[in-house]
Amino acid sequence: MSQANSSNQIKNQSPNSPFSNFLADLKSLYPNFRFQPGPRFLFRPPNTIFYEPSNPNDTNNSFQDFALQLLHELGHAISGHRNFQLSIDRIKIETEAWHAAQIILENHPNLQTKYHLFFNQDFAEAHLDTYRRWLHQKTTCKKCGLTMFQDKNQTWYCPHCDLI
């Protein structure tokens, strides 16, 4: 990371920024979880939530986006997500985490008021779409184009090419 980007992130994470204040509020509300800066938003069981520090030059990373992604990772933590066995389970736990994020926000109306936050279903669906596309790519047979299925050993089979 360049020094300019680093100083911009620090400036945007200043003690009075909504990013820092929101993070402090979540730490206070959920003291059993550790919130750490990292290269991306990620929940690492059993209790660490990594967040991508905001960059004021990135217009795609608004405070609303930052807050929703952080609530999503907290949703994983509160839901007790550890890992997934089957690829279809990935979509299930991602959906559960977005639902948990919505519930967290509903249970803390003070966060909604203080930070002018609202749960953006379109934002959540856009993120879920990335997993849906990933699963579609993973399940499409490269030979014939049919949808494959995964067994309990995480092996993929095409109903046409592999089972005939």
Across the structure, where does each feature detected by a protein language model lie?
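Active-site scaffold of zinc-dependent metalloenzymes
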Residues: 9-16, 23-64, 77-81
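Short alpha-helix boundary/capping segments
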Residues: 62, 66, 89-92
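Post-HExxH zinc-binding segment in Zn-dependent metallohydrolases
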Residues: 89-119
